[in-house]
Swiss-Prot record:
Gene that encodes the chain: rplL
GO term, biological process aspect, one: translation
GO molecular function: mRNA binding; structural constituent of ribosome
InterPro entries linked to this entry: Ribosomal_bL12, Ribosomal_bL12_C, Ribosomal_bL12_C/ClpS-like, Ribosomal_bL12_oligo, Ribosomal_bL12_oligo_N_sf
Name used for this protein in its record: Large ribosomal subunit protein bL12
Oligomeric and partner information: Homodimer. Part of the ribosomal stalk of the 50S ribosomal subunit. Forms a multimeric L10(L12)X complex, where L10 forms an elongated spine to which 2 to 4 L12 dimers bind in a sequential fashion. Binds GTP-bound translation factors.
Highest taxon above the source species: Bacteria
SUPFAM superfamilies with a match to the protein in the record: ClpS-like, Ribosomal protein L7/12, oligomerisation (N-terminal) domain
Record bears the keyword Ribosomal protein: yes
Length: 128
């Protein structure tokens, strides 16, 4: 009598957290594997490989945050519309609601370009 996958899943789903934890430990020992997520394993291995490399690692994604609109509010709204493809009302709400995030997870070049355009229009911008 063979056990089906569905029966195994049903059995595991009825286990308590403690039972499941012990079950996973037994499987890890029996098969010589780890149930840790690959990303977590890489984070643990990276500092061991070279702590100095982490400090030198450059951030690849940036957020563009509008801190203040400045005196030329209309000019800033125009730039916000061009950068974000928002409508006039939405762009005005972003500018009026400072501080507000205009772009998230963009490249360094795109973030610097947006900052330059907004600063030229009179806005105060922060890139994180």
């Amino acid at each position: 009598m063979a056990v089906t996958k569905e029966e195994v899943v049903e059995f595991i789903s009825n286990m308590t957290v403690l039972e499941l934890s012990e079950f996973i430990k037994e499987l890890e020992e029996k098969f010589g594997v780890s149930a840790a997520a690959p990303a977590a394993a890489m984070m643990v291995a990276a500092p061991a490989a070279g702590g100095a490399a982490d400090a030198a690692e450059e951030k690849t994604e940036f957020d563009v945050i509008l801190k203040e609109a400045g005196a030329n509010k209309i000019g800033v709204i125009k730039v916000v519309r061009a950068l974000t493809s928002l409508g006039l009302k939405e762009a005005k709400e972003k500018v009026d609601g400072c501080p507000s995030t205009l772009k998230e997870a963009v490249s360094k070049e795109e973030a610097e370009d947006a900052k330059k355009q907004l600063t030229e229009a009179g806005a105060v911008v922060e890139v994180k």
